[in-house]
Each structure stands twice: as C-alpha cells, then as structure tokens.
From Swiss-Prot:
SUPFAM superfamilies documented for this protein: PLP-dependent transferases (SSF53383)
Protein name listed in UniProt: Histidine decarboxylase
Residues found modified as N6-(pyridoxal phosphate)lysine: 233
GO biological process, one term: carboxylic acid metabolic process
Any coiled-coil regions, as ranges: none
Keywords per UniProt: Decarboxylase, Lyase, Pyridoxal phosphate
Organism whose genome encodes this protein: Raoultella planticola (Klebsiella planticola)
Miscellaneous notes: This histamine-producing bacteria (HPB) causes histamine fish poisoning.
Length: 378
C-alpha cells in the first residue's frame, strides 16, 4: 500500500514548512540545532523500553543499555552516586514532575504539596491526578518562591511532612527557587530533613547550572530528593522527552513486578519510547564537558545582549541570574504573534536557546518591540 499523490504532496508541503521554520523559535525553550542523522536507521524498529532498564525485559527490542549510560551521566551531573540513584528517560518534563510528586506522596501519604504561583501549569494537573493535598505559595516579583509565605502556610496547615516543589528555572521568568533557604527555613520550624520531600523542576536550567561558574543550589549534594530535566529544551530533540533522577531507596517503594514482561516497573508510563534514550545518549556522547560549557556560555551571552539592547532603548528588560530567559513588557498582539512569543499578563519573554548563532532574530524582535512600544506611548 502506498500514499496517494495528494497525500504525498501534503507531506511534501509540510516538509517545506518545517524546513522554512526550523529555527523560528525565540519564545519557547527548545533548541533546534540538533542532528541525529546517525540514528535514522533505527526508525524502522519498534523500540520499546517498558520497565526498568536495569533488569532483563522479555521485550527484546529495547535500548536499555543506552538508557543506563544516559542515567549514569545525569547521576554524575546532578551529584548523586549512580548506585544510589534511579531514574529513566521520560516523555517530557511533566512526567518527570509527576514522578517526583508521586514519590513524595508515597513517602508521605498525608503530606501537602507546596508550589509557587510561578510553577508550571502541569503541576495543578498532577495535583488532581495524584489526589494530593496542595497549597499555592506566593511568588516574588522576579518569579522566585516567597519563602516567608511558604513557611507561613506550612505553619498554618500544621504540616509535619511537607512536599516541596522547587522551580529551578520558572517557565515565564526563569527564576530559580533557593533550595538552601527553603531547607534552612523548614529546619527552623523544627522539621527534620528526613521528614519532608524536595523535588526540583529543572526542565531548562538543569542543563545550564552544571556548566556555569557560580550555580545556585539545585542538585542532590545541595539537598534535593529528585529532579527532572527536559531533553528537547537545552539539549535538543525532534521528540519531546526528559530525564528524571531520584534516590533509589525512595523509588524502590513503588516498584511492581510485571509477570508478562518478566521485569519490575517503576515508571509512570508502561510502554516507553526507546528512540529518545538513543537520542539523549548520542547527545551526551558527542559533546564534551567543555563543548556544553561553551554552548551554555554563548546562550547566556546572547541573553545578556538582548537585555542590554532593550535597556539601551529605555525598555525595562531583565533576566534572572544564570537564566537565558529575557523578560520585557508585553508588546501588541501583532508583534507577539509575529514572533511567536509566550506572554503572561503584562510581560513577554524571549529565550536565547543555542540555535541562535547570531543576533539576527533577536535584533528583529527587539526592533519590532521598540517600535511597537513607542507607538503605544504616542
């Protein structure tokens, strides 16, 4: 069976559209400069990573060996001994966050999840799906959690086992919650570290902070219990995916033996994409530490360039420390639609992902924003 000429033409038209718009993205955190051509031959196979990559699986076409090496890499990156960790390649950041919240709920079934107003919208869905108690915490103007409000609400709830959802780079403002302050503040309430759970959503910044000179606290050495990072954001992937890493002793609590695949399952989803672990493996094996560092540095420099250009025109643009997200006043609908910007209330942002090898798209956006805001002020 073959496609009709009409259907083939439809695919050809979509191909041309994708080629034309491959590097369009300036408003969302996805890097488009990836090349997984070497993996194209594997697309003829149904590769399924159901279950635990650390065990034998009766489904032979899996990429477990590659997934294991991916997890070794991220355990090292996030400062936890590999043998004390467990995680997997997820379908994206939301699944990683759900996994972290699920672990927290299983450890503290009656605990309350605390997350800030700047937290990704998916967490509200996770709260409903897990049927977990939750409390919304105020945010500071820069997008960081309001730590005083967090403590006030833990005290108000008389919560003895809080489950903390910390943002390591918020979606809109790129803010990083200070997990050192969070832990110190909870300690001052008389709650011991073993009596609460701390998950870190590092969807974008999880591949930035390990490669900068002065990172904010974010990893296991700094006190977290689990962390999620996206694969299609700073790394880049044609298929949305992510990586979640947690403490093995906590994951063992949710392990279930599945007889018909002859394996244990600890994951959220059953069947899992076996191609994305190959992509993440190729990405980490083909980039040295220094190459990642230069890639991140270039993006941070481009973000600062955008801030400087905005500010030189009298526009109140800014970014958080170690963030490639540049926040500025929301322009008119015509401008934000033209440049496919993400907007929230009275602000918009651009994200200086790694495929911006020069400033041309950023300059074009800034020129339009400057002209637009002048027009609005006239």
């Amino acid at each position: 069976m073959t496609l009709s000429i009409s259907d083939q033409n439809k695919l050809d038209s979509f191909w041309s559209y994708c080629v034309k718009n491959q590097y369009f993205n300036i408003g969302y955190p996805e890097s488009a400069d990836f090349d997984y051509t070497i993996l194209e031959r594997f697309m003829r196979f149904s590769i399924n990573n159901c279950g635990d990559w650390g065990e034998y699986c009766n489904y032979l076409l899996n990429s477990f060996d590659f997934e294991k090496e991916v997890m070794e890499y991220f355990a090292q990156l996030f400062k936890i001994p590999f043998e004390e960790s467990w995680g997997y390649v997820t379908n994206g950041g939301t699944e990683g966050n759900m996994f972290g919240c699920y672990l927290g709920r299983e450890i503290f079934p009656n605990g309350t999840l605390y997350y800030s107003k700047d937290t990704h919208y998916s967490v509200a869905k996770i709260v409903k799906l897990l049927r977990i108690k939750s409390t919304l915490v105020e945010s500071q103007p820069n997008g960081e959690m309001d730590y005083a409000d967090l403590i006030k609400k833990i005290k108000r709830d008389n919560e003895k086992h809080p489950i903390i959802f910390a943002n390591i780079g918020t979606t809109v403002r790129g803010a990083i919650d200070n997990i050192a302050i969070i832990q110190q503040s909870i300690s001052e309430l008389g709650i011991e570290r073993k009596d609460y759970y701390l998950h870190a959503d590092a969807a974008l910044s999880g591949m930035i902070l390990p490669f900068v000179d002065n990172p904010q606290p974010f990893n296991f050495a700094d006190g977290i219990d689990s962390i999620g990072v996206s694969g299609h954001k700073m790394i880049g992937s044609p298929i949305p995916c992510g990586i979640v890493v947690a403490k093995k002793k906590n994951v063992d609590r949710i392990s279930v033996e599945i007889d018909y695949i002859s394996a244990h399952d600890k994951t959220i989803s059953g069947s899992r994409n076996g191609h994305t672990p190959l992509m993440m493996w190729e990405a980490i094996r083909s980039h040295s530490w220094e190459e990642w560092r230069r890639r991140i540095e270039r993006s941070l420099n481009m973000a600062q360039y955008a801030v400087d250009r905005f500010q030189s025109a009298g526009i109140d643009a800014w970014r958080n420390k170690n963030s490639i997200t540049v926040v500025f006043p929301c322009p008119s609908e015509a401008v934000w639609k033209k440049h496919c910007l993400a907007t929230s209330g009275d602000i918009a942002h651009l994200i200086a992902t790694a495929h911006h090898l020069d400033s041309s798209k950023i300059d074009a956006l800034i020129d339009d924003v400057i002209a637009d805001l002048k027009k609005q002020a006239a």
